[in-house]
């Protein structure tokens, strides 16, 4: 049965979700704050407005009367989703989940205080003075982040008290929404970090994808690979934590649950997103029998999901813009990437550039049992051949 889906946020993840939805005969209205966003290029209709404007959001919902609302970004007046859900519209995964996960304070307190998950030690700060006091308790180095942000915006690794004032201002500048409050956490000496894609269903058990390893810079994803080779006991603990936190947040869909892994100290819950995850773009290489976007769509629609299996190993590496321009971006080097075997190039179709904006991704694959480190190197080398200008 065809459903009308209102997609809030139309970036590269939303684009892949729309493609999955269209393959199942769904009708999608893609929304974002700027025209020509990637998901708009493949949707049935689009709307351009600020999703932080609650009245504008209500007006778009009243106009299109969707069956399902699928948030793809954090910059949404999320409290409006509660009353839309009460009116009978399915919010993905749930209004509760979207509200909790867009605010690091809400999700961290739920995880650490209510559910008892192991997390980094943390405090909140509403002023520079509070930040300085918290840093004395935690020590250095420490991590400072806005309560509301994405893709590493406003995040700093602070190594001394002299850097706190700069971190305060940078955090406030990178904050989304109206709240100017930061979270300060101890820096975990981790050996690796993973994303555990977790699928909650309307009428089925919670499922887990093979763990995805990833490398970040400035809090933003640069490369990912699957499967991450981790201690089996660490994987069990991560699955236990992911199951617990997603059950508490309620709803059906895919979740990107992030963890720090330490050989010495075990598994730490970091954060989660109630939607397809950027590190999960590696699944576009066919690493699983169902990629993360197909899994999200099936969970949203209540369609059956078979056992998730690892079909082959994969790696992804991002293509960043070295410039900021309102002109349409151009690309060089695509031909070189296309010469590579078992390699896919994805240009997202963003209409303009920002410095270090993610403009595309290269994904590579190889048979199970192949050298994953060599595949990662191949993927990064291929991505480096693409120039944005």
Curated annotation (Swiss-Prot):
SUPFAM superfamilies: Glutathione synthetase ATP-binding domain-like, PreATP-grasp domain, Rudiment single hybrid motif. Disulfide bonds: none annotated. It is an enzyme of class 6 (ligase). Transmembrane segments: none annotated. GO terms for biological process: 'de novo' IMP biosynthetic process. It comes from the Bacteria. N(1)-(5-phospho-beta-D-ribosyl)glycinamide binds at residues 12-13, 72, 278, 350, 357-358. Its EC number is 6.3.1.21. One of its GO terms (cellular component) is cytosol. Mg(2+) binds at residues 258, 271. Pathway: Purine metabolism; IMP biosynthesis via de novo pathway; N(2)-formyl-N(1)-(5-phospho-D-ribosyl)glycinamide from N(1)-(5-phospho-D-ribosyl)glycinamide (formate route): step 1/1. InterPro entries: ATP-grasp, ATP-grasp_carboxylate-amine, ATP_grasp_subdomain_1, PreATP-grasp_dom_sf, PurT, PurT/PurK_preATP-grasp, PurT_C, Rudment_hybrid_motif. It catalyses: N(1)-(5-phospho-beta-D-ribosyl)glycinamide + formate + ATP = N(2)-formyl-N(1)-(5-phospho-beta-D-ribosyl)glycinamide + ADP + phosphate + H(+). NCBIfam families: PRK09288.1 (NF006766). Homodimer. Involved in the de novo purine biosynthesis. Catalyzes the transfer of formate to 5-phospho-ribosyl-glycinamide (GAR), producing 5-phospho-ribosyl-N-formylglycinamide (FGAR). Formate is provided by PurU via hydrolysis of 10-formyl-tetrahydrofolate. PANTHER family: FORMATE-DEPENDENT PHOSPHORIBOSYLGLYCINAMIDE FORMYLTRANSFERASE (PTHR43055:SF1). This is Formate-dependent phosphoribosylglycinamide formyltransferase. It comes from Phocaeicola vulgatus (strain ATCC 8482 / DSM 1447 / JCM 5826 / CCUG 4940 / NBRC 14291 / NCTC 11154).
